[in-house]
Every structure is written in structure tokens, then in C-alpha cells.
């Protein structure tokens, strides 16, 4: 959400707060999908709904797909969608979700190394910022805006 806000501020664009939904995850993914779908339905039923949605993870992107299907909104013709994480369900959905892929294996390795280092150096605090590469896996949920 922070990047969405910064993007708009930097370009002097009106921030559409009514396009933002913060979803708290439950224990079960299916509960989270249903909760997210309800929020997305509210957004998509607005007088001027968005033509694109960036979901902070692929589970939420699946909820967007369900909401769009329920409202008979054609993805990607009338709504583009991008998720994040490249979970298996993203490639198995119909249409397959365009997603940002992170290097999960490398992230796991770095996390384990940091944890082991921290456990052996308990009093040592080393704030560290690690930037990792990611890539866009373009699949079936994005297209050029239809109203241009």
C-alpha cells in the first residue's frame, strides 16, 4: 500500500482510497480467499471500478478472480490482475495469474544463514537490508487497458 501511495504522490495523481483493501489472513487459505473476495466485490461494484488490480500475494489474486467471475467481469479484457509469489495455484487457475516471482529458495537460504548467525551471536544486532531480484511472469490475466 505504501508504494501505491508513493506512486500517486510522486505523480500528483489522486489517491483512490476506495480501491484499497487490507485483508487479514486467517488460518485457512480458503477463509482468507472468501474474506478477500467480499472486499473485492465491494471495490468492483463501485460506480467507477478499477481496470487493474495488484494483489499483494497470489492467494488474494485468486480471490480477485473469484469476485470477477461472480460479477461476470472478463479477466483480462475488462480487468487486469497481477499477484505476487508465484504459488502453484497461480499457474493452475483459469486464466493463469500473472505474478511477480521471488527467489524463494534463495530467500530461504539467506534467512536460515541469518538465523544461524544470530543464534551464535546473540548480543549482536546487525540491521541489514537485502535486496533480491524478482521477475514478472506474464500469464493470462493482463492486457492493455480497454478504455484507451
What is each residue range found by the language model?
Residues 1, 5-33:
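Short beta-strand elements in bilobed, periplasmic/extracellular small-molecule ligand-binding domains
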